[in-house]
A protein has these predicted regions:
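A generic local secondary-structure boundary/capping motif
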Residues: 40-43, 53, 124-126, 146-149, ...
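Residue-level recognition of short, solvent-exposed, well-ordered loop/turn junctions
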Residues: 129, 136, 184-186, 295, ...
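Structural signature of FAD isoalloxazine-binding scaffolds in flavoprotein oxidoreductases
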Residues: 66, 152-169, 185, 320-331
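Catalytic-pocket segment enriched in acidic/His residues
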Residues: 40-42, 219-341
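Short acidic-glycine loop/turn motifs at beta-strand connectors
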Residues: 58, 65-70, 193-195, 265-266, ...
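N-terminal export signals
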Residues: 1, 7-31
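N-terminal non-catalytic cap/leader segment that marks the start of a structured domain
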Residues: 5, 10-12, 31-156, 325
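Short, structured patches in soluble enzyme cores that scaffold and shape functional sites
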Residues: 139, 161-163, 170, 177, ...
Length: 341
């Protein structure tokens, strides 16, 4: 790590800058929402008890729901039962359940088998496709701050990515096209906002959250370290894989009690728990909402635990390269896989 970057981190910190089981919906356990209609509203009634995803079909992003029969094709189910339904996760988050819970029950109990896809055969899309904001939190695990020789932050250190970074489960990160050499992983829990939040309290903050997903804040360290601003090392195309799913908040429970791991070519590199966060999810949402308004669909990468390559002694730093296969695992949320080319 350059002295320039280390000095910046210290100033910012002090001044305030094994496959895991994933729940699915069964015909006995679907919460039917009230339906919010097609008009976008600021605070829709959020869907509950669902594992949702986007998949690609005919150059479109289509909403799927993970069930015990496979991935429900929501659009085809809506057509069969002649009802309206959200078209993708962005629509679901922005406009609420829109009767999706009832539709899933109908499909499970009366739908044709053709409505359900084998999960191994779908082409995933990013779990959120068009957030207004992608917010990231730096140095938010105590042991990670220690391994990089930085003090524990006094306030959350916020930075951002852009939508060009969004990537999917089973996706590809084309590092060979990036003018950099020091590629690094960062396993991260992602918060998906469900309601407009401005100046919310810590006590209420998580009630504004739609759900959670597995994410990866992929980074080019040599670009990141060129200046005190991290952006150019964080915003390359495809540098923010997220997925496979979003679990609604009620299925996750306490987001700060989840095992989090990073694997590279089958070798575990990071192994921690979200309880090591310096600022927990409620604190992050509350703090961020006091800086700017969070909108439904905004996503927050909550920081990475210890074990990143940049935290190793220099003689042990072996940077990622084309051909490497990465897998990010977070308890309950599923395993996010992608390959470097």
């Amino acid at each position: 790590m350059s002295n320039q970057r280390r000095d910046f981190l210290k100033v910012s910190a002090l001044a305030g800058s094994a496959a895991l089981a994933t729940p699915f919906i069964s015909s006995q356990a679907v919460a039917a929402g009230p339906g919010a209609g097609a008009v976008r509203i600021a605070n829709p009634e959020m869907a509950k008890n669902m594992v949702v995803l986007n998949y690609k079909e005919d150059n479109q992003y289509i909403l799927g729901v993970k069930t015990d029969k496979g991935i429900l094709q929501v659009a085809k189910a809506a057509k069969q039962f002649k009802v309206k339904a959200p078209v993708n996760t962005d629509d679901l988050i922005a406009n609420g359940d829109q009767g999706l819970g009832k539709l899933v029950l109908l499909a499970l109990n009366k739908g044709k088998a053709a409505l359900f896809l084998d999960e191994s055969k779908i082409e995933y899309a990013p779990a959120v496709t068009n957030p207004e904001k992608i917010v990231c939190v730096g140095l938010n695990y105590a042991k990670h701050a220690k391994e990089t020789n930085n003090p524990i932050p006094k306030l959350p250190i916020l930075f951002n990515k852009f939508n060009n970074t969004l990537n999917s489960h089973n996706g590809v990160v084309a590092v060979s096209k990036v003018n950099a050499e020091k590629f690094d992983y960062e396993a991260e829990l992602v918060i998906v906002m469900g309601k407009r939040a401005y100046n919310v309290s810590e006590a209420d903050a998580l009630s504004y959250v739609f759900g959670y997903a597995t994410g990866q804040d992929f980074t080019a360290r040599d670009l990141q370290q060129r200046s005190s601003q991290w952006m150019i090392g964080k915003t390359n195309d495809g540098f923010a894989p997220i997925g496979p799913y979003i679990l609604t908040a009620d299925l996750v429970g306490n987001p700060n009690q989840l095992k989090i791991e990073q694997y590279v070519n089958g070798e575990v590199r990071q192994s921690s728990n979200t309880n090591d966060m310096v600022f927990n999810c409620a604190q992050i949402v509350s703090y961020t909402s006091k800086i700017f308004t969070l909108e439904p669909g905004d996503i927050i990468f909550t920081g990475t635990p210890e074990g990143v390559i940049s935290g190793y002694p220099k003689e042990k730093q072996v940077w990622l390269k084309p051909g490497d296969k990465l897998e990010t695992r977070i308890e309950k949320l599923g395993n996010l896989k992608f390959t470097l080319t």
